[in-house]
Amino acid sequence: RKEGKDFIVDGTQSEKVFLNSLSRPRKVMLLVPAGEPVDSTIKKFLPYLDKDDIIIDGGNSHYDDTERRYKYLKEKNIKFIGAGVSGGSKGARFGPSIMPGGDRDSYEIIKPIFESVSAKVKGEPCVTYLGNTSSGHYVKMIHNGIEYGIMQLISESYHILKNGLNKENIEIHNTFKKWNDGMLNSYLVEITRDVFKVKDEKSDNYLIDLILDKAKQKGTGKWTSQSAMDFGVSIPTIDSSVSMRIISSFKETRVKAQKLYSKKIISSTSSIKSDDIEKALIFSFVITFAQGLSQLKVVSEEKLYNLNFEKICKIWRGGCIIRAQLLEDFMQAYRKNSSLDNLIFDENISEIINK
């Protein structure tokens, strides 16, 4: 796919010159940090915008902020789209998964652009209109919550392989390679597989053994947990993953506690095989997606998003961080029953879980 290396981009030095250079209705996409930077950028742009121009917020904005901005701009006759974007650096180069929400007529105007730049799976763009106001950013928040959960599950699987089964890094690489060739085929398992082979250029030691076990977070996982509690939805895997990130950040406290308590060897892991861990991870992948999607189901009904869950799973299949082969199974489940309360109630999904 062309990356636009020969594409000419004109730079400007002022908001006025930039906005006057755009065709009408203007379509302005913001990719700035969530919070105040979004509001300040909108404030700077407003004097140079006309009726029915469209502002697109492509950052990880909180859904409450998106609703506030939508109402504020509507009063000024400016269209607003809150669009979740997933894909990282690869998504920027080869096409992301895009999750837009707002007015349908506004989306129809930007639809050709989004479909052109988004990732493609089987020739189909990984973007679709999701629903009103904050639906796009809410779906992206849930996407990130699921991502948190899966990353924690992968981390714990690695820990058992490394410290429970005493496997070497190359063995773990081969194990993850086998997993990724099967039902666990996914972006996160794929990149984790590759990490185990990487060596540090300075010491020639494996990089995985040198990485500080201290994770940071941008807040979207926390927002997912907070919102689930507000709406009375249980998402224990995602909640636990957020807590584990917080625990990991207290490195000094953990080291201090480690000195006070002796490390005991647990012999019960001797009966566990990597195939057992694979089965547990498949089960946990399904459950994590089920938790996130069940939260979306409840909130969609509360906020009248009218989300199409088959389409959500469809656009998550490419360009995004939680891309996974299992999404094909989830799509089929929602195709059979669009009002499915929880994935675990689908017959085919229950067969996967029972294995």
Where are the language model's segments positioned?
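Membrane-water interface at loop-to-transmembrane-helix junctions
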Residues: 271-282
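Hydrophobic beta-strand scaffold residues
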Residues: 11, 80-81, 235
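A general alpha-helix detector
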Residues: 141, 156, 223-224, 276-277, ...
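Glycine-centered, small-residue-biased loops immediately flanking beta-strands
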Residues: 53
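C-terminal substrate-binding/catalytic lobe of Rossmann-fold NAD(P)-dependent oxidoreductases
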Residues: 121-133, 166-266, 308-355
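Rossmann-fold dinucleotide-binding core
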Residues: 38-43, 56, 62-174, 182-210, ...
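Conserved N-terminal Rossmann-fold NAD(P) cofactor-binding segment
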Residues: 1-27, 31-49, 68-77, 259
